[in-house]
Amino acid sequence: MKNLIAFFLMLFIVQQGFTQNQPQNLLSGKYSPEELKQILIPQSQWIPFPKITDREGWAKADKQRMEILLKNAEGYLDYDFPYIPATKSLLIVRTGDRNEYQAISFKKRNVLGTLLLAEIYENKGRFVDKIVDGVWSVCEESWWGVPAHLPKTPENAGLIDVSKPFVDLFAAETATFLSWVDYFMGEKFDQVSPQLRKRIYYETNRRIFEPLMNQYHGWMGYKTDGSRPNNWNPWICSNWLKGTSKNHIFPFSFSMILI
């Protein structure tokens, strides 16, 4: 056992030395913005999954799994998307509990995702209004992150300062989630109200893209103290890229994000 531990410790040390000597700007160091624009396909041509109008594509989905999902979605037709009380967020400083807040937040997103997939599969319109309610409810949340990730400062004291949005794991994930909703439901949303997609873009830009472009986040690393990026970095950045690639009115180009 001691030999095994020593082996992995040595492997870790060697790996650290190897990675420290490798260039960190593999993408930006290889391609210029102009070259990226030539390499990347136009956003309109990027179709990672069949659109809701591609019935032939969705006919290939696993029927048994989709029927189960459809039944689950039917059980949510009477679900009311709740707001999250401030006192649920305050629990993080009052009792240390993070689960009550997260249970409400995660449930809302799980329900919305189930309704979304059911509507995509069935395409009869009966889940649209409930999806609209879900999107609007998420957009009206004060923060898309979780209280456990709030700064431990008297200024916050268990609540988000909505004038100073910052990006944690779940905020970034929510931005990508809403961009997928828009990707699949955009045309149906336009038939309901143009304000739906406009709200998604507004909230995503305000809460996610603008803070990421204009302010330093500790998980980014390498500012003045020599800190390294932490494990939040790849998750948030991957959601950042996915979100921008599907948000067609985001003010910064996708190639600009990549560099």
Segments from the language model and where they lie:
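Long, well-ordered core segments of solenoidal/helical folds
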Residues: 73-84, 131-149, 195-220, 257-259
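Bacterial Sec-dependent N-terminal signal peptides
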Residues: 1-23
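Internal amphipathic alpha-helical repeat/solenoid segments
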Residues: 86-101, 151-164, 220-228
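Short, 15-30-residue, compositionally biased linear elements
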Residues: 72-75, 97-118, 243
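Active-site lining segments of carbohydrate-active enzymes
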Residues: 158-259
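Non-membrane alpha-helical segments in proteins
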Residues: 107-121, 133-137, 172-183
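Low-complexity, Ser/Thr/Pro/Gly-enriched N-terminal "stalk/linker" regions
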Residues: 21-93
